[in-house]
Each structure stands twice: as C-alpha cells, then as structure tokens.
Amino acid sequence: MGSSQSVEIPGGGTEGYHVLRVQENSPGHRAGLEPFFDFIVSINGSRLNKDNDTLKDLLKANVEKPVKMLIYSSKTLELREASVTPSNLWGGQGLLGVSIRFCSFDGANENVWHVLEVESNSPAALAGLRPHSDYIIGADTVMNESEDLFSLIETHEAKPLKLYVYNTDTDNCREVIITPNSAWGGEGSLGCGIGYGYLHRIPTRPFEEGKKISLPGQMTGTPITPLKDGFTEVQLSSVSPPSLSPPGTTGVEQSLSGLSISSAPPAVSNVLSTGVPTVPLLPPQVNQSLASMPPMNPATTLPSLMPLSAGLPSLPNLPSLSNFNLPAPHIMPGVGLPELGSPGLPPLPSLPPRNLPGIAPLPMLSDFLPSFPLVPEGSSAASAGEPLSSLPAMGPPSDPVMTTAKADASSLTVDVTSPASKVPTTVEDRVSDCTPAVEKPVSDADASEPS
C-alpha cells in the first residue's frame, strides 16, 4: 500500500472516513464506493477532517437529494468525485448503507493482517479464509495495533466473530463469521498463520484479471504513453530495442555480423610446429600493415634488457675420443656404471658366468655393468694394464643432450691369464706385505751350547 497520498486533498490533512463495508443495492453501492480502499473526505465541499457529527448532519439534511462526494482511493492514489443520494427507502440500514470509521490514510493501510497458511478442518478453514490472498482489514470494533486482533480473538473464544476480509484475487471485501476454538485439534484458536507489518500489506495495484499481456513476438511499434500518475508501462520482453550507437561503429558491427561460428574443429596450421606462439589469425589487411612495420630490437627499445649475441658461444675443441680405452673392470674395483638402459636401445643379453681356477668367480656382466659410470662413445680396444692417469682430461661435451652412452660387452676385456703365472705374484705380494719377524738377541750364555 502507498504510504501517503500522491495528490493534495482540498482542505489539507490525511484523514477521512474509511469505508469498511458496502451493502448490496445501497446508495453507497450505486455510487461505486469500494470497501477498504475508499475514504470519504468531503461532502458538498465540506472537508471531513474531524471525527464528529458533521457527516451525519450533512446526510440528514440531504435525504432523497443528490450530493457531491469527494473520495480518495488508496489503491489508485487518486481523488474522484461521485454523486450519492441518501435514502431511507432503499431497503437496508443507514442512509448510505455503508460501514465507516474515521482514521488516517496511512493508519488504515498499516492495520492489515495477512492470512498465511490455513490448516484443514480448522476454524479458519471452516469460515472460508483463503491462504495468502485474504487480508483481515477490520472488525466491528476499531483495531489500531497489531495486538488488537489477537485480543479480539481471545475475547471471542467459542463465540462468533465478524471480520472484514479483502481478497486480492477477487479484488473485493466480504464479511467472514469465524468462531475461535483452541480445542479444534491443532495449533492456535483459528488454525491459520497471521502476518502483520510492511511485508504483509495489501498491494497498491493488484493484478487485474483478464488483462492482456503482450508476448515478445507480439510487440508493436506504437509509442509508449505515460500513465496519469507519471509511471510508464514497460513491457517485459526479450526483444531489445535498437541501441543508439555512434556512426563509427556501424562498419565494425557489419564486419562482426559476417562472422560465423562453426562447431567443426578448425584446421591446425603449420605455424604450430615452428614454436611460434599460437595467436588468432588476423585479417589480410591487418597482416599487410604488420608486415610493413620495421623490426624492433629489444636491446635498443628496452633499456633493462642486455643485448644477446647472435648465437651461442663456441665451445673449446674437444679431444678425439677414438683413442680412449676403457679399463678392465677388475682394475677399477668399486667404480660403478649407471644403468645403460635407454628407451631407444634393446636390453643387453645376459652372459654366462665365467669361473677361472685359482681366482674368485667373476660376477655376472649384468650385475656390474649398471655400477659403471656413463662413458661417451670411444674405442672398444681397452688395455688391461693402462693406468687411469694416462687418460687425457676431457672437456665438456658440445651438446649434453645429444651425448649418448654406448657400451657393449665387446668393449670390456677380461684378464684370462693362466692362473699359474698369476698365483706366484699374488703370493709374493702377500709375503712382502707380511709383518717382519721379531729378532731375538742372543747372549753369550745362549750362544754357548751346553756340554
């Protein structure tokens, strides 16, 4: 509901006689008075801004005579003028056949109780209250606060209670007779939820039944005309109006409109295999403009970058590896070669063990080959007696990535000298390494032999 009127009331103020109920075929019904939303603010130019007998006196003085009535609607926030003829002959109670109370516009809109969930077989359901669409707007007694309704329900326990209810679906007010009963079998005395406050007020402009809604495909080119209250109707449509764009963007939009999106995967260009970053292909005119640009040198344009030489620095000449001999394995005990396995080379076949008489059996070739260091490709002729110091110093390889270690069983020589020539040498070495015998001095007494 609106919080205040949008038009100025003649005579000022925000008070009037609130119409609560309109009887059928009454003078007020013929004048078009609407329950709950209409406020009688003046009759024949007399402002009704006080709760006194002015309204009764004016009606009694004009029985069976038409009078001009100024009415303010809190639904449309507008003033309208209506003609009504007070009468005692219409067949009901009162000269107008309406129930009224004096209050302010804002107070009437705030004192509304929203009917929420309604339990089945409850007093509210038996009285015909409708969930979410019914609003309790008053009773026979004045209710100005939220607790007034609950106090009224407690005082009418097991007694009929008349309530004025407005329904948003039918856009009409009606009388509801309800009998509060706390023993109905559920929660509360009414068996329904009640909402009160700003979020539970009656909408100012409820939806009009039978109103046509234009669909997106039914839009017309008719101009939009503002309403009387200053608001403009906006059609909720997915079709967007043409946007105002500067003349310079017309060509870009036309060129973009020619682009097509295809679900098929695009062909891979040869540029991907050359290491060039993959960037979107530019139109031909852009490529021509880029080709005419002079090359840029980062060293001259960026002061923080150091200039790089055209190529990598030359490496020193490496000695020829063809003269290198691989020492025999038994001369280098404890030195290991890494595993020669490579994804591109077949594995080395295993050799049978060779046991020579007089010496310890040699391990399998597959056992000690992985313990040797990786040696670059060299000659397969290896001298068993060549010392390690005779090997020339090797420089770093020209390309560490391309260096491969190729070793074969033929590049290794095993000393197969007869054991007869080797055993004495070994015995002599062992004798020479033995600790010399301790010499015992001989005295004169010991030197003479006993007789």
UniProtKB/Swiss-Prot annotation:
Location of region: Disordered: 236-255, 377-451
N-myristoyl glycine lipid sites: G2
Knockout-associated phenotype: Mutant mice have normal weight at birth, but display growth retardation and lower body weight during postnatal development and in adulthood. Females display normal fertility. Males have normal mating behavior, but are infertile, due to defects in spermiogenesis and acrosome formation.
Alphabetized Pfam families for the sequence: GRASP55_65
Effect of G97D: Reduced interaction with BLZF1
Residue list for modification Phosphothreonine: T222, T225, T417, T435
Modified residues (Dimethylated arginine): R30, R47
Tissue: Detected in lung, heart and testis. Colocalized in a polarized fashion in the acrosome region with JAM3 in round spermatids (at protein level).
GO cellular component, one term: endoplasmic reticulum membrane
Region feature (Important for membrane binding): 194-199
Record PTM Phosphoserine, positions in chain: S214, S411, S443, S448
UniProt subcellular location: Golgi apparatus membrane; Endoplasmic reticulum membrane; Golgi apparatus
Secretion signal, residue range per the UniProt entry: none
GO annotation terms (biological process): cell differentiation; establishment of protein localization to plasma membrane; organelle assembly; organelle organization; response to endoplasmic reticulum stress; response to unfolded protein; spermatogenesis
Positions with biased composition (Polar residues): 410-424
Subunit structure: Homodimer. Homooligomer. ER stress induces phosphorylation-dependent monomerization. Interacts with BLZF1/Golgin 45. Identified in a complex with RAB2 and GORASP2. Interacts with JAM2 and JAM3. Interacts with members of the p24 cargo receptors. Interacts with CNIH and the cytoplasmic domain of transmembrane TGFA, prior its transit in the trans-Golgi. Interacts with KCTD5. Interacts with TMED2 and TMED3. Interacts with SEC16A in response to ER stress. Interacts (via PDZ GRASP-type 1 domain) with core-glycosylated CFTR in response to ER stress.
The protein, known as: Golgi reassembly-stacking protein 2
Source organism: Mus musculus (Mouse)
Protein's gene: Gorasp2
